[in-house]
Curated annotation (Swiss-Prot):
Catalysed conversion reaction: (2R,3S)-3-isopropylmalate = (2S)-2-isopropylmalate
Name of the protein this chain belongs to: 3-isopropylmalate dehydratase small subunit
Metabolic or biological pathway, per its Swiss-Prot or TrEMBL entry: Amino-acid biosynthesis; L-leucine biosynthesis; L-leucine from 3-methyl-2-oxobutanoate: step 2/4
Enzyme class, spelled out: lyase
Phylogenetic classification of the source organism: Bacteria, Bacillati, Actinomycetota, Actinomycetes, Streptosporangiales
Gene name of this polypeptide: leuD
């Protein structure tokens, strides 16, 4: 997993609320067995509309998605996180996320930042007025900065540490490989091994 400390980039204003995981990536795109190649399925139904925000050239280099409230509702779908990452997004800002989506995102290295809805609206207006506006998502100091906006956000210490170290569940397990091997040596021979 890629480390996340501070990211500065352009943003994409997604003025939709209640975006569910099937809208993020429809089920027809979930047939791969790898974590890559899902960017084509991201918001696939909406991308058929030439006026959809991701089709606008001024937002093609966006790395921060500013979404409406209740982003990521619906079924638990890690592919939704992968599609956002494969497209190039490093962070998603919203006033509310579905719990399961947020958990999948943070475990997968996609920072989801909860900000007050009035701040989300300020950021939408700022980015729509000037698509070249850069936003900084600072995990070290737990704040989002853009022009005259400096907004703190909350994230528990453990999740913050994992993101800053670039550690997913497998990486955390591998940190204990010696202890696991030692445990296996002490197990009774008739018990199954855990390797």
């Amino acid at each position: 997993m890629e480390k996340f400390t501070v990211h500065t980039g352009r943003a994409v204003p997604l003025r939709y609320s209640n975006v569910d995981t099937d809208q993020i990536i429809p089920a027809v795109y979930l047939k791969r067995v790898t974590r890559t190649g899902f960017e084509d399925g991201l918001f696939a139904a909406w991308r058929t509309d030439p006026d959809f925000v991701l089709n606008k050239p001024e937002y093609k280099d966006g790395t921060i998605l500013i979404a409406g409230p209740d982003f990521g509702t619906g079924s638990s779908r890690e592919h939704a996180v992968w599609a956002l990452q494969n497209y190039g997004f490093k962070a998603v800002l919203s006033s509310r996320f579905a719990d399961i989506f947020r958990g999948n995102s943070l475990k997968g290295g996609l920072l989801t930042v909860v900000l007050p809805q009035p701040v989300i609206e300020q950021l939408w207006e700022m980015v729509e007025a000037d698509p070249a506006t850069e936003i900084t998502v600072d995990l070290v100091n737990r704040e989002v900065r853009a022009k005259d906006i400096v907004e703190p956000f909350e994230l528990d210490d453990y999740t913050r540490w994992r993101l800053m170290e670039g550690l997913d569940d497998i990486d955390l397990t591998l940190r204990h490989v010696d202890a696991i091997a030692e445990y296996e040596k002490r197990r009774k021979p008739w018990l199954p091994v855990t390797q």
